[in-house]
Amino acid sequence: CLHYGHLQHLEAAKKMGDILWVSVTDDLHVNKGPGRPIYPQEHRAALVKALRCVDKVITVSGLMEALEFVKPSILVKGTDYRNGLADYHEKYCRKHGIRIAFTDTPKLSATDMILEAMKR
């Protein structure tokens, strides 16, 4: 589910470049557990596109597909990726001159927020 942490991350990413492309993982490739995703890819993409900071949205099977389609100059990831992307993502970025940057926004989990709210 789209939440405030996503908005913070996307606003920070927008400040790093001119056009902010956001990739939404398609329903078939979302790895969040049984019964997920809760919302279909079209709904998730529409919600992301509605954010003022987002210029373009694509639905993809994974990061490699997004990189090959967009051909960005910068790949911006959240703090949870600071310990490293998959080796093949890093190699692809190096080979194609794509700078990897990270936002400093805190990692939030929609599932954790929902579970915490249910305890109240």
Regions of interest found by a model, annotated:
Residues 1-120:
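Nucleotidyltransferase catalytic core that binds NTPs
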